[in-house]
Structure formats: structure tokens, C-alpha cells
């Protein structure tokens, strides 16, 4: 669920998910095309690809379960599809955290007109 994704970003990357990543580069936020602009945008590209591999549930709307154990996010629940969504979200939040040092404000509200190059395959 997109709100849960925001929660995981807050917990893991210590950033407001929607504010920092809702409108960043060519892939962070709704849709995505072109070439990822930097490491953070690549996190979103990989997250989009991850969602694209999920079958049997709706990554943007289905609610999943997770817990925090020793500072780590552990995806759980009986539904393997929802667990997969959680893992996509968790991995993206970790990617954001690991690339905070290269986050570049010039890609915040990046004009989509610059995202015209052919997308690379997932």
C-alpha cells in the first residue's frame, strides 16, 4: 500500500516519503519513463520493476503486514503476494537510505519532458 511505503521510508530512510520521493527524477512518483537520473531515481526504477513482477494482488492498494525486529523491517503475513509488495517497499526504502548522500534537489519536481530516452529493461 502506498501509505505503508511512505511509512517504511520514514522508518528506514528517516525522510518524508511523499515530500522527498513523490516527485523526484523520472521514476519516483506516478509513472516512469526514460533513464533514471541518479542513484535515488534508480531506486524508484527498481521499485517500479519490482511492483511489475507482483501478480495476484495490487501493490499500490493492498495492505500488508510487517514488524520491526532489532531495527530491521521484517515482512510477514500469510499472503505471499502481499509479502512480496512489502519486500519491494522495504528494499526501496533501504535503497533511499543508502543513497541519501547523492540525493540532488535538482531532480525534485524534475520536468518529465527530460525523461524521453528509451527505458532500459527491468
Curated annotation (Swiss-Prot):
Expressed by the venom gland. It catalyses: a 1,2-diacyl-sn-glycero-3-phosphocholine + H2O = a 1-acyl-sn-glycero-3-phosphocholine + a fatty acid + H(+). PANTHER family: PHOSPHOLIPASE A2 FAMILY MEMBER (PTHR11716), PHOSPHOLIPASE A2, MEMBRANE ASSOCIATED (PTHR11716:SF9). Disulfide bonds join 26-115, 28-44, 43-95, 49-122, 50-88, 57-81, 75-86. Its cofactor is Ca(2+). The keyword Kinase does not apply. It comes from the Eukaryota. This is Acidic phospholipase A2. May form tetramers. InterPro entries: PLipase_A2 (IPR001211), PLipase_A2_Asp_AS (IPR033112), PLipase_A2_dom (IPR016090), PLipase_A2_dom_sf (IPR036444), PLipase_A2_His_AS (IPR033113). It is found in: Secreted. Keywords: Calcium, Disulfide bond, Hydrolase, Lipid degradation, Lipid metabolism, Metal-binding, Secreted. Belongs to the phospholipase A2 family. Group II subfamily. D49 sub-subfamily.
Amino acid at each position: 500500500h502506498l501509505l505503508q511505503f511512505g511509512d517504511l521510508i520514514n522508518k528506514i530512510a528517516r525522510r518524508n516519503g511523499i515530500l522527498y520521493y513523490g516527485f523526484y527524477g523520472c521514476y519516483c512518483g506516478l509513472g516512469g519513463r526514460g533513464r533514471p537520473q541518479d542513484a535515488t531515481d534508480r531506486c524508484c526504477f527498481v521499485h517500479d520493476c519490482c511492483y511489475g513482477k507482483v501478480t495476484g494482488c495490487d501493490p499500490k492498494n493492498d495492505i500488508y503486514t510487517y514488524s520491526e525486529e532489532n531495527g530491521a523491517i521484517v515482512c510477514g503475513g500469510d499472503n505471499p503476494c502481499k509479502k512480496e509488495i512489502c519486500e519491494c517497499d522495504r528494499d526501496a526504502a533501504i535503497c533511499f537510505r543508502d543513497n541519501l548522500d547523492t540525493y540532488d534537489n535538482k531532480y525534485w519536481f524534475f520536468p518529465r519532458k527530460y525523461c524521453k530516452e528509451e527505458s532500459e529493461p527491468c
